[in-house]
Regions:
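Compact mixed alphabeta submodule
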Residues: 96-119
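Non-catalytic beta/alpha edge segments that cap or flank active sites
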Residues: 113-116, 120-310
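A generic local secondary-structure boundary/capping motif
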Residues: 37-39, 62-63, 91, 106-107, ...
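Short, charged beta-turn/beta-strand-edge "cap" motif at the junction between a beta-strand
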Residues: 71-73, 78-79, 109, 118-126
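Cysteine-cluster motifs in flexible loop/terminal segments that predominantly coordinate metals
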Residues: 79-95, 296-308
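Mid-chain, well-packed structural core segment of small domains
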Residues: 53-84, 216-246
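Electropositive, beta-rich accessory/interaction domains or terminal extensions
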Residues: 1-71, 76, 110
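Short, basic/aromatic beta-hairpin or loop at an interaction surface
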Residues: 38-48, 85-100
Length: 310
């Protein structure tokens, strides 16, 4: 039996907490396919729940599952392995980065081996989900307070968005690209707004990193997500002299904003954009959970430091 709470996830699990990756799940069918290469026990990939009948990667983030009284909401697809992942060292691959998913607990309760798992119908009008990334060398070193990021969060919240993540990064293209890919592909947020790094100095790399991860260019959105306002209205916005990019990666719109609070305030207002909503078939389905696992180790997961649920 496992006990789950919204505040922590799985009680006694070392990776629990008030965050979006409280519970990890893997499809039983994916594990069986991997076993044709090498035998692994349930829990070897660090998963908490092994479930039959679901191809999790084909489901959109925010999918909700009912297991008895427990309700889980899928929050992320995949996660890169740690450098000391034993399975990856032995076989050259691990299925968790591409097949594993994570969820938060919306409603707590008990889970038992063999409980039925139901995919719940999607919400009729879910809020749009966003992330905010501030690019600043000095800010990342603690030498300057980030004022633009919180301002953007305030604007997004006022417009009805749910801000899933905020982060402060140095002006490094590699780090920015990695986070843009993770937020767009793994977390599937509707909108990513970056602030900073759009000027003309050698360290201003935000547009280049943004274009590098893009599937399509979306220049019209530089006049505001959904094109609701224009930057050309007087008085001139402090952010006009900018190399900012606006692109699409999958179903995620990525828009670069200037770095200063004044320039951010001079940008177009953010409005909810219905076209950002994913339209995916979402049918009610049920599966059967095979075996729960509780990760009891405080460090990266190893097959040797996992414990089966009692």
């Amino acid at each position: 039996m496992l006990v789950l709470t919204p505040e922590w996830g799985i009680v006694s699990d070392a990776h629990g907490g008030n965050w979006h990756r409280q519970v990890s799940l893997l499809s039983a069918e994916k594990i069986e396919a991997f076993r044709k290469k090498i035998w692994v026990d349930y829990g070897a990939f660090g998963e908490n729940l092994v479930i039959e009948g679901f191809d999790f990667r084909s489901l959109p983030v925010t999918s909700r599952f009912a297991i008895g009284d427990v309700v889980l909401e899928m929050t992320q697809i995949g996660k890169e392995c740690h450098n000391d992942c034993v399975i990856k060292q032995q076989t050259g691959e691990c299925i968790m980065p591409r097949e594993g998913v994570f969820a938060r607990v919306l409603k707590g309760g008990e889970i038992h081996v063999g409980d039925e798992v139901a995919l719940l119908p999607p919400l009729e009008d879910p809020p749009l989900r966003a992330a905010v990334i501030t690019l600043s060398d000095k800010g990342s070193r603690g030498e300057r307070e980030d004022k633009s990021g919180p301002l953007i969060v305030e604007m997004l919240t006022a417009a009805g968005y749910v801000v899933e993540e905020t982060m402060l990064l140095p002006d490094e293209a590699k780090a920015l690209k990695a986070q843009l890919i993770r937020l767009a592909d793994g977390r599937q947020v509707n909108l990513i707004l970056t602030t900073g790094g759009t000027g003309f100095s050698p360290r201003d790399i935000t547009p280049e990193a943004t274009y590098a991860v893009a599937d399509r260019n979306a220049p019209g959105h530089r006049r505001g997500p959904c094109g609701t306002h224009s930057l050309s209205h007087p008085p001139p916005s402090p952010g006009v002299l900018s190399r900012a990019a606006s692109v699409l990666r999958g179903k995620t719109l990525i828009v670069n904003l200037p770095g200063s609070p004044k320039a951010v305030q001079g940008e177009p207002r953010v409005h909810p954009c219905p076209s950002l909503r994913a339209r995916r078939p979402h049918r009610r389905r049920s599966g059967r959970r095979v075996r729960p696992q509780v990760n009891c180790c405080p460090a990266p997961q190893h097959p040797s430091c996992r414990a089966a649920a009692r």
